[in-house]
A protein has these predicted regions:
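Membrane-embedded catalytic scaffold of the fatty acid hydroxylase/desaturase
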Residues: 1-141
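A membrane-cytosol interface segment of integral membrane proteins
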Residues: 140-169
Length: 169
């Protein structure tokens, strides 16, 4: 999970990788389907590369990669849902919809210029590295990024956008 947190943070701080991850952040309404809005290149790097590396480093069978991936999809659906679930004290350990919606906020304070709440499953990494931002329950926040109204919305254009030479780095 920590490696996923690191990669997710890189997707926000590396300008080239952000081109691909930006597709995921082009949602303006949070629901479980937002979890599946991503660029295929990002998913290959983020999940494929990570799981293959882990299976090689730890030497576990490839079938376990699929189990982990299925669990991550389930957690991702939950965290991208519009459910107002209170985890109580467990919010410091497990990522949750109330925390993750702020990851998709259109605006952040200056100290979070590259975003916040990079947790995938365990929010403990964000608390540990001080990348947590959750000023309220997140029900009325604006999602996306600056100039999102100019960003493509069709599938083909979303897939082409990161490869354009004039795409903002």
């Amino acid at each position: 999970d920590f490696l996923q947190w690191v990669i997710h943070r890189l997707l926000h701080t590396n300008r080239f990788l952000w081109r691909f991850h930006k597709v995921h952040h082009s949602v303006t309404e949070m629901n479980f389907a937002a979890h599946f809005r991503f660029h295929f290149v990002e998913h290959f790097i983020y999940k494929g590369g990570l799981y293959l590396l882990l299976s090689w480093l730890i030497n576990f069978e490839l079938k376990y990669v699929f189990y982990i991936h299925a669990l991550n999809i389930l957690i991702g659906h939950l965290n991208h849902s519009n459910l107002n679930i209170n985890y109580g004290v467990f919010k410091y350990f497990f990522n949750n919809p109330k925390l993750h919606i702020w990851h998709h906020s259109k605006s952040f304070p200056k100290r979070f210029a590259n975003g916040a709440n990079f947790a995938i499953s365990l929010s403990v990494w964000d608390y540990m590295f001080k990348t947590v931002y959750m000023p309220s329950d997140g029900k009325l926040i604006e999602l996306g990024f600056e100039n999102i109204e100019k960003y493509p919305q069709t599938f083909v254009k979303l897939m082409q956008e990161p490869f354009k030479s004039n795409t903002e780095l």
